[in-house]
Amino acid sequence: NKILECLYKIYGDFDHLFMDEIQNIDEWFLFVNRLLRTGMHVLITGSNAKLLSGELATHLTGRHMKIELYPFSFKEYCEYLDKSTAHGTTKEKGLLRAVFDDYLHDGGFPELLNEKRKQTYINTLVDSVMKKDIEKRYKIKYKAAFENIANHLMNNAPSKINYSDLQTLFGLNSDHTAENYVSYVKNAYLICGLHKYSQKSKIRIRDEKAYTVDVALMNNREN
C-alpha cells in the first residue's frame, strides 16, 4: 500500500503497473490479485520459466497472457544493425556471410551488440542468474557442484544430458539432485533441452541434448 501511495503521488492516476522479478517476494500473488480486481493492468517480467508457466496459472485469478522473449534471431540481429539480408548476388552472399559469422560469435543479446567488454557482460549476466535467480530462489545446498554443472552444460553444448554421469562427475549424492540442478538451469533460460526426433518416446527421452539459449553463452565467457 505504501508503494502504491508513493506511485500515485508521483505519477498521478494510472492503470498499468510493471513488476520485475516479483516472484522473489513471498505471497506476491495476493497483492497482484488485489490489483487485478481493481481493474489494474499488471505486467510481470521475470527470468524464470517456472514463474512464466506454473506459478502464473496457479496463483493468478482470471486470464493472463504469457510472452517469452529470447535473444535476437539472425533476422532480428540484421534488422537491429540495419544490415541487408539480401543474398541474390555473389556480393550480397559474401556480405551476409560476414554478418552471420559475427552473429555466430557475438550472439543475439541486444545489450551485447553495443558493448565493447562482451566477455565481462556475459560473465556478469551468468553469475547474476546463477546466484540470484537460481541459488537464492531454490536454496541450493551444493552451490559449487551446481555452478560446475551449469558451466559444464554451457561450455560443452551441444552435449547429451546424462544425470548419472553428472552425479559422478560432480560428486552429488544422487542423480535426482543432478536432474533438479539441470532443470533449474533450464528454467533460468541459460540452456534449453532438445530431444532427438523419433517415433519412440523412450528414444526421445533418453537422448536429450543441452544447448545454450544463445551462442554468446559459449563464445563470450571465461571457461
Where are these regions (language model features)?
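Hydrophobic positions in the central parallel beta-sheet of the AAA+
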Residues: L17-D20, I161
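Structural recognition of the conserved hydrophobic beta-strand(s) that form the central parallel beta-sheet
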Residues: F18, H41-S47, E68
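Conserved ATPase-coupling elements of RecA-like P-loop NTPase cores
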Residues: I22-V32, G54-E55
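Accessory nucleic acid-recognition modules appended to NTPase machines
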Residues: K116-N223
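Interdomain motor-coupling "hinge/lid" segment immediately C-terminal to the ATP-binding subdomain
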Residues: S47-A49, G54-K160
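Hydrophobic helix-cap positions at the C-terminus of alpha-helices
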Residues: L7-I10, I25, L35, N156, ...
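Short glycine-rich substrate-engagement loop in P-loop NTPases that contacts/grips substrate
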Residues: N1-H16
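Conserved catalytic network of the ASCE P-loop NTPase/AAA+ motor domain
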Residues: Y8-G12, R34-H41, H59-L60
